[in-house]
Swiss-Prot record:
Coiled coil: none annotated. It comes from Clostridium kluyveri (strain ATCC 8527 / DSM 555 / NBRC 12016 / NCIMB 10680 / K1). The keyword rRNA-binding applies. Pfam families: Ribosomal_S19. This is Small ribosomal subunit protein uS19. GO terms for biological process: ribosomal small subunit assembly; translation. One of its GO terms (molecular function) is structural constituent of ribosome. Disulfide bonds: none annotated. Keywords: Ribonucleoprotein, Ribosomal protein, RNA-binding, rRNA-binding. Gene3D superfamilies: 30s Ribosomal Protein S19, Chain A. GO terms for cellular component: cytoplasm; small ribosomal subunit. Protein S19 forms a complex with S13 that binds strongly to the 16S ribosomal RNA. NCBIfam families: rpsS_bact. Belongs to the universal ribosomal protein uS19 family.
């Protein structure tokens, strides 16, 4: 279920404050955050935000296509190594 339109999009206040300060100064720094549930706003375009994935911070460069999505969508928490190939050890030999 999506968030109520009445409430508006969620973004952590401290993250938005840091973005606005950097925009005023005209700087582009990597901003560390643990707030995966924050919605990406248009003010964030062009910044790199390091989103925590559970063990490290993954740098995410914000582009126009990402506006409206959550930060956590771009920092995967699980590593997919592909399906296991069948080998002699994994297959049962019927006798």
């Amino acid at each position: 279920m999506s968030r109520s339109v009445k409430k508006g999009p969620y973004v952590q206040e401290s993250l938005l404050k840091k973005i606005n300060e950097l925009n005023k100064k005209g700087e582009k720094k990597v901003i560390k955050t643990w707030s995966r549930s924050s919605t990406i706003f248009p003010q964030m375009i062009g910044h790199t935000i390091a989103v925590h994935d559970g063990r490290k911070h993954v740098p995410v460069y914000i582009s126009e296509d990402m506006v409206g999505h959550k930060l956590g969508e771009f920092a995967l928490t699980r590593t997919y190594r592909g399906h296991v190939n069948k080998t002699e050890k994994t297959t049962r030999v019927s006798r």
